């Protein structure tokens, strides 16, 4: 049982390492996104350093706490989102802006970009409600107990975002 688990974890790490290498090449080859990309224009947000693939999909990066590129999320013109196959996502984020006294944490890129544009404050893209807890933990570890972390969850009818935000807040002392 333990051997099988160790083998699965080793395979996952290998797959994630391969994906990270591939993603790095794709990210480097991509062009800078412009404000007229259909997704950005529809959301009314700046590119914030996002890139585009050769076929026009927006690429937004997922970094580890130490700044290592782990994966990308591809966003089509109509807003369909897909992660790069095999890439790590848990605890990975993208920091928009320079961290200061307060860091916001949002579920998705559009929400984070809107917050960053409206406040001028740093906002981490967690990419999903379920990633709010690990991202908050990674930021708490990186910036310490005194860092003001503010979670901005989606207000979905299901309440999923709020539940994960409450868990992250309770576990890591975020607001």
Language model features with spans:
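Structural alpha-beta junctions
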Residues: 121-122, 144-146, 167-175
């Amino acid at each position: 049982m333990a051997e099988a688990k160790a083998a699965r974890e080793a395979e996952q790490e290998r797959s994630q390492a391969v994906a990270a290498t591939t993603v790095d090449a794709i990210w480097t080859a991509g062009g800078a996104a412009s404000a007229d990309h259909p997704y950005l224009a529809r959301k009314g947000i700046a590119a914030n350093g996002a890139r585009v693939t050769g076929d026009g999909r927006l690429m937004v990066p997922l970094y580890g706490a130490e700044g290592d590129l782990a994966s990308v999320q591809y966003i089509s013109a109509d807003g369909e989102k897909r992660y790069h196959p095999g890439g790590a996502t848990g605890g990975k984020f993208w920091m928009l802006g320079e961290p200061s006294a307060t860091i916001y944490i949002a579920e998705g890129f559009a929400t984070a970009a809107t917050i960053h544009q409206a406040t001028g404050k740093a906002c981490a893209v967690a990419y999903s409600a379920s990633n709010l807890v690990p991202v908050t933990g990674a930021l708490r570890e990186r910036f310490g107990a005194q860092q003001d972390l503010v979670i901005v969850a989606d207000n979905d009818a299901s309440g999923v975002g709020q539940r994960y935000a409450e868990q992250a807040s309770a576990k890591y002392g975020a607001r």
